Each structure stands twice: as structure tokens, then as C-alpha cells.
């Protein structure tokens, strides 16, 4: 099938990308942000190397039918690509028993609205990375203040969708010991809790005191 959806890699089996589910996890090229602790900076390039086609993804899912609970679209940032809803619809058409998950940083709220508002492209579960409070976010990911506002608009929209029973939502953040994000965790937890959700905290590994990735 034809879809603007560049795939940088596929993990055929994963037990860590959707809590409680065994998934195939699809990683797209391209990410608009440059998180200081990013372990996969090669995926930030939207024109980076691809390793599989959408047809090959469908073949893999067919070969594992009955073994997987779901497919998760991750990145990079999958909402960058116009082909995402097309691919989700094709998964639902071919594999109606398979759940669909999405990892996103929320920087494109309009596209998240489009996905969720259409039942044929709506994810069953979303893992939303709330990287920082709005005023801190530009320094952590290299976005503009407008980009930070967009990310929090996505949080508000997805929290409402979750409360309405349209999808499951996990909100998570990444922090490192001794950094500004660790200091702000209590406030970030309060902000997420005010939307009826819990914040999952992931601790960055192989980073320096400023959070920059130093691993090999």
C-alpha cells in the first residue's frame, strides 16, 4: 500500500511499549525535538534511513497474528507523518483484533485531534511524553514557547478523551537526578493529577549532570 510513513525500524516483540501488552513496535523517522537525554538522535532526521515498508509491516503482523496483543507506533514522532492515519486504518481493516497504540510528545495537537476524532484512526492507547512544564520545555527539547503550549494542549485534549472513555492514556516524563526536572517533579505531578491522571516517571540513564546523553 502507498502511505507517507517512513519506518526506521520494527521491534517484532516488545513487552515494554504498552503496559500489560505484547506488541510489535514501529519506529518512524523524524522528531521535531532534540531532547538533551535522547538515546536515539539518529531518529530525529525525518529523511533518515528507513528499514521497512508499510507492506512489510503488514506481512510481519500477519505472520504473528494471534501472538501479539497490539501494534505501537513510536519514533521519532509518528504524528509528523501524514500516512499515520492511513496505516492505522489498514491495521484495523486487516487485523481487527489487534490493539493500536501511539507514542507521542504531543507537539502537533491538530493531528492528534484528527486521529482521535475519527474512530477508524483513533488509537486504543496513547503514551504521552510530557517532557517538562511549559516554561521549562524549550530548554529541555529545543522547542519554541508556542511548541510548548501545543504539547500541553495535547495533554488537555487527550486527558478529556481519556475521561470520556475514548482511549486509554499514560502520561510520563523523563528526569535525571540533580537536574531541574527532578526539582519540578512535584509540580508536574500536581498538574497531571489535576487532569485526573497519574504521572509515570522514567529516569534517564547514561546522562551527565545537565541531562545530556553520554552513552555510547
Regions found by a protein language model. Give the residues of each.
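Short, conserved beta-strand segments within well-ordered enzyme catalytic domains
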Residues: 25-27, 70-74, 101
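N-terminal "domain-start" segment that seeds a small globular fold
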Residues: 1-12
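Conserved AdoMet/S-adenosylmethionine-binding subsite of the radical SAM
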Residues: 58-67, 80-215
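Residues in well-ordered beta-strands of folded domains
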Residues: 8, 27, 172
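Canonical Radical SAM [4Fe-4S] cluster-binding loop centered on the CxxxCxxC motif
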Residues: 11-52
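Conserved G/P- and acidic residue-centered "switch" motifs that form tight phosphate/ATP-binding loops
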Residues: 77
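Conserved alpha-helical substructure of the radical SAM core
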Residues: 41-72, 82
